[in-house]
Amino acid sequence: MSESLRIIFAGTPDFAARHLDALLSSSHQVVGVFTQPDRPAGRGKKLMPGPVKVLAQENDIPVFQPKSLRSAENQELVAALNADVMVVVAYGLILPEAVLSMPRLGCINVHGSLLPRWRGAAPIQRSLWAGDAETGVTIMQMDKGLDTGDMLRKLSCPITADDTSASLYDKLAQLGPQGLLATLEDLAAGRAVPEKQDDAQATYADKLSKEEARLDWTLSAAQLERCIRAFNPWPVSFFMIDEQPVKVWKASVIRQQSHATPGTILDAGKQGIQVATTDGILNLESLQPAGKKPMSAQDLLNSRREWFTPGAILA
């Protein structure tokens, strides 16, 4: 049995909370939790705590919510906890160099990709969008760069043809805690072997934007279908019709060529709404008009068939 480590945990969303939960079930001691300030949520815009804060409070762990860790006062909060290591998972704040070196074993991060591929804010979505065959998690020793630290452990999983960002998120939320606990065991026993990243192989996962979710019919059907899966559950791919956005939750690729202008509706029936692209045909299967719930193509056609007349061009 390796030594029990004093751990500071820093994270905010559900993905992070699943890692904190694993730590709470381990032999290690979580001595403090750093998480982002409460945010307005819901129709009433009431301040709501994130999943990590809720879990920490349920377990009587001290919670700290600074807007930044740049001030000496907030850095002293970290130092006073006298931690062996700081575990960072989707925290959302940059750690200054002074904080990175405070714990005896430094700070480690769980990142949702196989580094150095997809450094940055949206690795899960970008791996899907790019058509990668696999992804995974990397546990790394943090340094001052953006996801550039030495790698301590990598765990991989395949990306299937029907994975969405939501399903991939769940897969990585199971892999991550496994890798984290194994890495902490290695660190505690002094047997961790850091591996340098090859910067020449690095790619960057830029943050998603709502504008980017608009379907560009000049892409191939395969690219658009991946885009739809990558942007599910947020921000959700869409096209415009009658100056209204229509979200697309599910689509499939028909591997035959059309010589119609990209965006042209070729057919519309109970199997879906078929749209021409630069390469192949995209079959829209689950859609959501503004103000409505997601529905099948057939249900949408029952109420809005005039939107999808063959020969019309979608914006």
From Swiss-Prot:
It is an enzyme of class 2 (transferase). Keywords: Protein biosynthesis, Transferase. GO terms for molecular function: methionyl-tRNA formyltransferase activity. One of its GO terms (cellular component) is cytosol. (6S)-5,6,7,8-tetrahydrofolate binds at residues 113-116. It catalyses: L-methionyl-tRNA(fMet) + (6R)-10-formyltetrahydrofolate = N-formyl-L-methionyl-tRNA(fMet) + (6S)-5,6,7,8-tetrahydrofolate + H(+). The keyword Transferase applies. PROSITE patterns: GART. Its EC number is 2.1.2.9. SUPFAM superfamilies: FMT C-terminal domain-like (SSF50486), Formyltransferase (SSF53328). It comes from the Bacteria. InterPro entries: Fmt, Formyl_trans_C, Formyl_trans_C_sf, Formyl_transf_N, Formyl_transf_N_sf, Formyl_transferase-like_C_sf, GART_AS, Met-tRNA-FMT_C. Attaches a formyl group to the free amino group of methionyl-tRNA(fMet). The formyl group appears to play a dual role in the initiator identity of N-formylmethionyl-tRNA by promoting its recognition by IF2 and preventing the misappropriation of this tRNA by the elongation apparatus. Belongs to the Fmt family. This is Methionyl-tRNA formyltransferase. It comes from Cronobacter sakazakii (strain ATCC BAA-894) (Enterobacter sakazakii). The lineage of its organism: Bacteria, Pseudomonadati, Pseudomonadota, Gammaproteobacteria, Enterobacterales.
